Amino acid sequence: MRKLTTILLLALAALSCQTEKQNPWNEDWDKPDQPDKPQPVATAKPRYVWIDAAANFDDYGNSRDRIREDCKRIAQTGFTDIIVDVRPTTGDVLFTSSVAPALKRIDRWKGSSYEWTERTADFDYLQAFIEDGHAAGLKVHAAMNTMVGGYLCPYGLGKEGMVYSDSSKKEWCTVQNRPEGLVNCLDIDEYGARFLNPAHKDVQAFVISLVAELAAYKELDGIVLDRCRYDDSGLMSDFSETTRKAFEQFCGHSVSPWPSAIFSPGTESLGSAVSSLQREWLTFRVKTIHDLVEKAAAKAHEVNPKIRFGTYVGAWYSSYYTSGVNWASPSYNCKTEYLWASADYQAAGYADHLDYIFLGAYAGADYIHGTTEWTMEGFCKLGAKRLASAVPFAAGPDIGNSSGFPEGGKGSLMPDIVKTCIGNADGLFIFDLCHIKMYDYWSSLKTGIDAYLKTVNNQ
């Protein structure tokens, strides 16, 4: 018994003499258990659908019920956001404004010709979409055609918009360097939108005022500038005296003869050689748009710090210089790829001033896959390269107007389109809602979106 007691005492003594490291296999034995680090949760990318004002006006211009019903269906299909056009190409508006006229009518294609559709309702069009979109679980963004002020309509419908109703606004309009000479766009008899001059200080102030009015809608989720560019005549615009003075100040010398020192009459795109003055001219145009976008973004955030601000652009960057827009990141070295670009042109990339951007990947129905422009996949991949992570972007096709789409019957392509575009961008963008409805693409788009969401949930 005494021997057993001695052994026990020796064992206790040995334990008492151990170091503080009681459990050498676990140094932190005496510390509280730490919870496992949470694994990052996969977040689904946003899915946007555009709602063009003119194309959808018969449904929504005078019917709050249809707005409510279709917002629900859009959400049920799997879209997360709607982009509502509230300033179509006439330049009149579908929101509360003290600086732009309210839209009273719009020309609509009615089977065999264009006809006027009158707005008889008095509800706030934008506010209706905000309320009904949010009720359906959608985020709501307002888009406006920025550099437009009127429209010359076909089929004898005549003229519409503030540049036609207010004669003082003619000086706001672009002057084109046409084959017959310098012509104000209001004096041209070709059908289409009439563009405002981005270099005109009064035009810039007008645009900023419109942005401020949109931002004043406190529940609005975002503002998207569409057609924030020079007009559809390519490099023929703008050669007004206002622009001449601004350009000469920009480059620091007089330009004579005007405008042939830059381009001969009727020039719409560049040739194989580009002069130093032409590079300065192209840089001046993109810098003009850059500065306007920067000011508009600042105004939107000043009025409403929570609102997002962005633009829609065509993804065809290689020829978008004709529109006077450099939507890329200023870190994208465009001057090594394009002979028309300079270091100053590169610096005028405006992507870093945006909260988001929408790229029209408007390839034809037979060109979903590829690595180049004019394929949807190529547009997305090149867009990512050019934006260089400066801003998140959504991309997608025009499913009603691009080659192969106008005939409809492309529902079988929608799942692949969704997979391709959302897989190579930060979000999906579909133009336009009217085409989804016209060709009944609801279920095929839902199939594609559901398949995408399944991959997110399995991560």
Predicted region positions:
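Bacterial Sec-dependent N-terminal signal peptides
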Residues: 14-43
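Substrate-binding cleft of secreted/luminal carbohydrate-active enzymes
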Residues: 342-459
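Active-site-adjacent "subsite" loops/lids of carbohydrate-active enzymes
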Residues: 40-61, 142-217, 267-278
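Catalytic domains of carbohydrate-active enzymes, especially glycoside hydrolases
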Residues: 65-92, 217-220, 346-359, 424-428
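Substrate-binding cleft/loops of secretory-pathway carbohydrate-active enzymes
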Residues: 149-152, 156-157, 233, 303, ...
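Aromatic- and acidic-residue-enriched segments that line the glycan-binding/catalytic groove
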Residues: 94-107, 148-189, 227-269, 322-333
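Glycine-rich, aromatic-flanked loop segments that form ligand/cofactor-binding clefts
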Residues: 79-90, 125-187, 224-227, 305-310
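Aromatic-lined carbohydrate-binding/catalytic grooves of carbohydrate-active enzymes
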Residues: 79-121
